[in-house]
Regions:
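Serine-esterase "nucleophile elbow" of acetyl-processing enzymes
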Residues: 2-51, 58-67
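Alpha-helical cap/lid subdomain in secreted, periplasmic
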Residues: 5, 32-38, 56-189
């Protein structure tokens, strides 16, 4: 892989799906991805239980301390699980994108899917938030990284929400080309 000569920093602003929930941090996908992106720095800003509002509150300090070249936004799952308004999610994610871009960082936005028990109208409105924001200038939209994992009980913890340790290498495999794309400063095809 040909990376830019400049080492870059990517901040992952996420929730428990990125925070190694239910396992040691060393076994999580972020840590597994680090050696594959040698010379670059992955900063975990993932906190279990985080909502888009919580991520927005924490973001200025994370941008100041990490000074990232790119921000991977992986928030919304807890907003959906709590039945928060898609309009509120959109407002928070828009501010996260704006703050990240104002700091000079490129933005990679991960789609998030909500459980089907919330009904098709809520799920559609929720998905539309990501589609709309992913179309903004300077934002790369990444498909939901749990697709293919969440339906496999062998890859999920007993709660049916969080990926287990066996899923972490698969998530790292999924993430790697997206991170490379961001590091090469071009949208992924």
């Amino acid at each position: 892989m040909a990376f830019p000569l400049k080492a870059e920093t990517i901040l992952i602003l996420g929730d428990s799906l990125s925070a190694s929930y239910g396992m040691e941090e060393k076994d999580g996908w972020i840590n597994l991805l680090r050696p594959r992106l040698e010379g670059h720095t992955l900063v975990s800003g993932a906190v279990s239980g985080e909502t888009s509002a919580g991520g927005l509150r924490r973001l200025p300090a994370l941008l100041e301390s990490a000074k990232p070249d790119a921000v991977l936004v992986m928030l919304g799952g807890n907003d959906g699980l709590r039945g928060f308004s898609p309009a509120e999610l959109k407002k928070n994610l828009t501010k996260i994108i704006d703050l990240s871009q104002a700091s000079g960082a490129r933005v990679l936005l991960s789609e998030v899917m909500v459980p089907t028990n919330y009904g098709p109208r809520y799920a559609k409105a929720f998905a539309e938030v990501y589609a709309e924001l992913g179309a903004l200038p300077g934002v790369t939209l990444m498909p939901f990284f749990m697709t293919g994992i969440i339906t496999d009980p062998q890859l999920m913890q007993r709660d049916g929400i969080h990926p287990n340790e066996a899923a972490q290498p698969k998530i790292a495999d999924f993430m790697q080309p997206w991170f490379v794309s961001v590091l090469e400063n071009r949208p992924k095809a």
